[in-house]
Amino acid sequence: MPAQISSEDQQLSTKIAERLKRDEAGLVAAVVQQFDSKEVLMLGWMDDEALRRTLRSGRVTFFSRSRQEYWRKGDTSGHIQMVKAVALDCDGDALLISVDQHGPACHTGTRSCFDGRALPAFVEPVFVEPVA
Amino acid sequence: MPAQISSEDQQLSTKIAERLKRDEAGLVAAVVQQFDSKEVLMLGWMDDEALRRTLRSGRVTFFSRSRQEYWRKGDTSGHIQMVKAVALDCDGDALLISVDQHGPACHTGTRSCFDGRALPAFVEPVFVEPVA
């Protein structure tokens, strides 16, 4: 007699699936943050199955919009992301994935996908006390 | 003679616009992070004009997917986001907006839109040394 496999192992639980507000492609945005330094490493996309794999396996899996396929981060590069925690935002269209990132998160070799990519911006004037 | 207004004041600069990889609705994801605590506060959406306003004004402006209109964060609630820095990721489909958030970021009253909204997840087993 084969071992029973619960439907929860095969599909994202209904309770979570009901809270997702997917875009027209069936995806939600997934913000990936290093758990200790709090650095934002990258943003990827997940459908129900990518989220299920991420929650069940301890490794982050995305759905690639350009390649239209699942990719488990690090399978090619070795730069894996071990899941520390996952949260879904108030309106269900964004996930925050807390991870331990091994090596650089970015395919260009930088630690985060935002490193060295600042845009020119006007920021709030800061009041500076004259040095006495 | 009226003051000259450069095209840069009216439109997002071509240099930045060329780097954006917009979705089918013309939007990129914008991750908002508190500049000092590094907490991820929320995720919003920006088109070219919302990004231009954010870069030029020092206040974060999003484009609402549900209401199909611009909203400058805090205009209704008072919970404004002052821009500290903006970066665009390696493939141009995500922005990281570093801000000083006044009050809660979430419309539900929590500091971040992810607070108290964790999903059950399997995480990497952690090796614990027995206490001697």
Curated annotation (Swiss-Prot), chains A, B:
It comes from Renibacterium salmoninarum (strain ATCC 33209 / DSM 20767 / JCM 11484 / NBRC 15589 / NCIMB 2235). Its cofactor is Mg(2+); Zn(2+). SUPFAM superfamilies: HisI-like. This is Phosphoribosyl-AMP cyclohydrolase. One of its GO terms (biological process) is L-histidine biosynthetic process. It comes from the Bacteria. Mg(2+) binds at D89, D91, D93. Pathway: Amino-acid biosynthesis; L-histidine biosynthesis; L-histidine from 5-phospho-alpha-D-ribose 1-diphosphate: step 3/9. It is found in: Cytoplasm.
